[in-house]
Amino acid sequence: FKNKFRYYLNSILSKINFSYNLSMLFQLLILTILILTLLTALIYPPNTPDSLSYHMSKVMHWIQNGNVEFYSTAITRQLYLSPFSEFVILHLQLLTNGDYLANLVQWFSMIGCMITVSLINKEFGGNNKSQLFSALFCATIPMGILQSTSTQTDYVVSLWIIILAYFIVRYKTTKSIKYIYAFAVALGLALITKQTAYIYALPFCVWFLFLTLKRPDHFLLLFTIPIIISLINFGQFKRNFELYGNPIGIHS
């Protein structure tokens, strides 16, 4: 009986395309997470203490004042912290006359992270199934699921840092100069999104520096990186310097 059972079981299993079914399972799980988080982001308005006291309050002050200059407030982090995510929310707020789409900034950033992680996997030789698994791993990070339905900035800055890492990998593979400029833009956007990028981007900057040391002609182009970063962050650097005397604000 055991031999017959084993025979029939092996016959059934041999007819199942596990590779195909596993890929379908990964896609189904990713789609389920995206749909559930999208519905949550659309149905529920921004309601975390951080959203109400910082992110959305900053946006409403800008709308009320008609500009993004600093204003009088007891919550000074509304001023000196990097404002990129809130700039995007500001546009959505004005276009829809409400906060209906405010949570989608982080939700789309989650999708961007999933795509970029899968592309990095591909650069290291991953096949379609491993790329899907990478995207699924990214989508199932518990804090990521919570962040994807809020107006916080962690997923947005994560997106820029992951893109930055992808450009480093592409530069290592192709040695193309365009990835030096792409790296600079991604780094500048990360810094204008959240100031923790100064810490988390540092190891990638060191890695990129070592890669360019192997190409003296490319190494000289590194001097364009701080210029690009300064251009992207100029407005916030200027406002912080005028009020606090330094470009990154009160805690420097």
Whereabouts are the PLM-identified features?
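Membrane-lumen/periplasm interface segments of specific transmembrane helices
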Residues: 44, 210, 220-252
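Transmembrane-helix motifs of polytopic, lipid-linked glycan transferases
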Residues: 34, 101-125, 163
